[in-house]
UniProtKB/Swiss-Prot annotation:
GO terms for cellular component: chloride channel complex; plasma membrane. It catalyses: chloride(in) = chloride(out). It comes from Danio rerio (Zebrafish). It is a multi-pass membrane protein. InterPro entries: TMEM206. The keyword Transmembrane helix applies. This is Proton-activated chloride channel.
Amino acid sequence: MPIGFNKACLKNVFTVILVLIYLALTAVAVFLAYQTISDFMDKLNHPVMSVSYKEVEEFAAPGIVLFPGKAHLLSCMHHYHDNIPPLVALENLAKRECMKEEVIYHGPYSNQTEKRALVFRGPTDVRNRELIFLQLSRNETEEDFSAISYMIFAKFSDMLESSDKAAFMMDCERNYSMWTFSGGFRTWVKMSLVRTSGRRNESVEFRQESSVVKYIDKRPPLEQTNELFFIVFQWRDPFIQQVKDIVTANPWNTIAILCGVFMALFKAADFAKLSIKWMIRIRKRHIRAKMREMNQIS
């Protein structure tokens, strides 16, 4: 009997150890399931940014908006292959080579401020390095700094097709950045287009590189009181930068891992249940054997 008792005791101890091992494995499986779900939700809520470049033959004509204030337009011309002819006398300047619209509207942040905007049709032929060259003149200013503000929006045709151009310009001023260029210099702006696609909307942004060259004024001293402004707009390269949010979370991979974890949990639970039943059966058998031994002694 002591030998049988020792065997039963060893079996019980071994079974308890197995149950503890499977409980530990169950805890690991639960932690793995929690970690898998947490990683999936984190990747779902924090998509990664993908950047690609699309090559185009030509761009849609952007809208170039100047806010001249008291300045007036002298000339607007299109040139190609980075070639700008030498400046000519003011009376010989060509004014009507560019397509433009004049819009009067109130600023989006203050209804008291009335703005005058000159909207030009921007260059399109990036392969032939098309550019637009603007010259302006201003003879007086009440501001502390001599500069003219400008902005660029996506499509000039959108403004032409708009039934309310004033409201359109207000929306552009809210959504697009504003830049400036100074008098007495030729500012050369090279534009690039960036399209950003989010979950709910798509935005268009213009990035620019600018270089500034001082204008050598050869006019008579009396005419130099009229300050001249020069600005060039050109596409930098034939590529559109496309920025997209990509969700790297793979639901099928997550589901497969969770299925494996739950199968392991069910197997562990089933084994634990059978082990406990077997321990109870062994315990009852041991008690019955002990009772028979006591009855024989009595």
